[in-house]
Structure formats: structure tokens, C-alpha cells
């Protein structure tokens, strides 16, 4: 099987592991720098060029699109889809997952556990939305942020209002969420492949940091999740339409609450914490499911 991966950095652990796992199973996997792909739009002949040459012959594509090039990356992925190449995660599902508000709206629609969340455009409504999520304290997030960037814990009404006004003054969109104190600076990352949780880890934030992202200096360890947490992760992946994703949850007093569904989860932390060959499971899933022209939109919204 011939697989393409849309990614800018071939040296990332996740990307090297996917190449290794594919080659170990007798497949070829080419890493294509997303920004060097050119989309050629013509009736009945959707093509993609890479470094000036037309791309052809791929059975599947793995999108590992960086947040900073989401729109361009999704345009390239759509072109692969229109050419009949099977995507590990579809463009419409990735687009959903990159919009935190849209993700929350979809998950809420299906009754999945979420932290109290509010969204408003007018900074004059700051106090109203802080109270709507039982704050302060509150967590304020950029809609487009990743890896814990653009996430602020505001512990007083005045600091929360100041942060909201500053973000809105910079004309960026934000969510305001309740602070789940009982989580104690830890969260759970459940990795879903093909509708099953294949691995889970507990992430703990660095000292004096409520964010548990590994990119922010947090640590990870193996954890046994509850049946409710497993079901929550599987349902989140299903309703977001994602074949592979990382579902980040907090343990609250009223059960698991979803913080984010990541459509391009890193493999290093979870493979090392669990000692599982997750890259291999992803490649096996592709080999079992990739068929030419088998692209259809899943999920709602």
C-alpha cells in the first residue's frame, strides 16, 4: 500500500514512528510538506502537484496538519479526497475539531459531559459570562489555541474581566469555561483508533501550571480509565467523525468532562507512557479500511 502523509516536519517522533510502522508492514509512506503541495482545480480532473510534479498513485493519506496552516492544509486534503484517496481523518471532521466552539456545540448536542462553557462577542458582557460558568475562577481560552497556548486561569472577577477585555481588544475569539478544581492540574488523554480506545495516559502539569500539556513541561503516566471515560472518548470520536483522535478529559465531581478532541494527536508521550505500538495500530487500521473512493462525511454539524 502506498500512503502519503501531509506534514511539515519529518523529524517529529510521531511522523518517524508512522513511517517506521508502515515500512515494517511492507507499505511505503511518503512525507509530503503540506505547504509545497499545489492544488490544481479543473472540471473532472482534480490534481495535486508537489514540487512541480503531479501526485498520483496513493491509496491513503494521513493528515498531520499544523494549526497555523489549517485552512491551507484542509484545502490540500480535500483535493486528495476529491481524487479518491482515502483519508485517515476527513477534512470536514478536522475542520470541526479545530474550532473549539463548534466542537463543544456538537458534543453538547449528543449529551457528552462538558465543563460549563460560555461564548460572547461583547467585552461588556464579561461579568455575565463569568457568572454563567459559576466563576470566578474561570479558564479563558483562545478558540484557535493549541498545546496550551492562549489558555489563562483567572482567579478573580477583576482579573477575568481584564483578560477577556484584552483578548477581545486584540480581536480574537475566546471561550470562558468553569475551572474544574477537583482535577488537580491533571487530565486524561484517551487515544481512539477506529472507534476503540487503544491507549490512555494521565498528564500532570508542571509545577505551578494548571495546564497539563506535555509541550508545557507536563509529565505522563499509564492510567486505567473507567468504563464511563472509555465510553465518553469513543462517543466523542464518533460524533466528531474522527477515525483517529486524542480525547482530553478531566475527572470532575459529576463524571468525565471533555476539554478537547484533538484530530492530530502526538504519539510520543502516550507511546512512552503506555509502551504500546500505537503507530502500528494506526497503520493496521489504514490497511484494513483504505479503499479508493471510499470518502464520505461522518459526524454532524
Curated annotation (Swiss-Prot):
Location of the ATP-grasp domain: 104-287
Positions annotated to bind Mg(2+) 1: 248, 260
Cofactor: binding comment: Binds 2 magnesium or manganese ions per subunit.
The entry's keywords: ATP-binding, Ligase, Magnesium, Manganese, Metal-binding, Nucleotide-binding, Protein biosynthesis
Enzyme Commission code(s) on record: 6.3.2.-
Enzyme class per UniProt: ligase
Residues binding Mn(2+) 1: 248, 260
One Gene Ontology term from the biological process aspect of the record: SOS response
UniProt cross-references to SUPFAM superfamilies, sorted A to Z: Glutathione synthetase ATP-binding domain-like
The name this protein goes by in its record: Probable alpha-L-glutamate ligase
Gene encoding the protein: rimK
Amino acid at each position: 500500500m502506498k500512503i502519503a502523509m501531509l506534514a511539515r516536519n519529518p523529524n517529529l517522533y510521531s511522523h518517524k514512528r508512522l513511517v517506521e510502522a508502515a515500512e515494517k508492514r511492507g507499505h511505503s509512506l511518503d512525507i509530503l510538506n503540506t505547504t509545497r503541495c499545489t492544488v490544481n482545480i479543473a472540471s473532472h480532473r482534480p490534481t495535486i502537484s508537489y514540487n512541480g510534479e503531479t501526485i498520483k498513485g496513493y491509496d491513503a493519506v494521513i493528515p498531520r496538519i499544523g494549526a497555523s496552516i489549517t485552512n491551507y492544509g484542509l484545502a490540500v486534503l480535500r483535493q486528495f479526497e476529491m481524487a479518491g484517496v482515502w483519508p485517515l481523518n476527513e477534512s470536514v471532521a478536522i475542520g470541526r475539531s479545530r474550532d473549539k466552539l463548534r466542537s463543544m456545540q456538537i458534543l453538547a448536542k449528543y449529551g457528552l459531559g462538558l465543563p460549563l462553557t460560555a461564548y460572547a462577542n461583547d467585552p461588556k458582557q464579561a461579568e455575565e459570562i463569568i457568572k454563567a460558568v459559576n466563576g470566578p475562577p474561570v479558564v479563558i481560552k483562545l478558540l484557535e489555541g493549541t498545546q496550551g497556548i492562549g489558555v489563562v486561569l483567572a482567579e478573580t472577577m477583576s482579573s477575568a474581566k481584564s483578560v477577556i477585555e484584552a483578548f477581545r481588544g486584540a480581536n480574537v475569539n475566546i471561550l470562558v469555561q468553569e475551572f474544574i478544581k477537583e482535577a488537580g492540574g491533571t487530565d486524561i488523554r484517551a487515544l481512539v483508533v477506529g472507534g476503540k480506545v487503544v491507549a490512555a495516559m494521565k498528564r500532570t502539569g508542571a509545577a505551578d501550571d494548571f495546564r497539563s500539556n506535555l509541550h508545557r513541561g507536563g509529565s505522563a503516566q499509564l492510567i486505567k480509565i473507567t468504563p464511563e471515560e472509555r465510553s465518553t472518548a469513543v462517543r466523542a470520536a464518533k460524533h466528531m467523525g474522527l477515525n483517529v483522535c486524542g480525547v482530553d478529559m478531566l475527572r470532575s465531581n459529576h463524571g468525565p468532562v471533555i476539554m478537547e478532541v484533538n484530530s492530530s494527536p502526538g504519539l510520543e508521550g502516550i507511546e512512552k507512557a503506555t509502551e504500546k505500538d500505537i503507530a502500528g495500530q494506526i497503520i493496521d487500521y489504514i490497511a484494513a479500511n483504505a479503499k479508493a473512493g471510499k470518502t464520505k462525511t461522518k459526524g454532524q454539524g
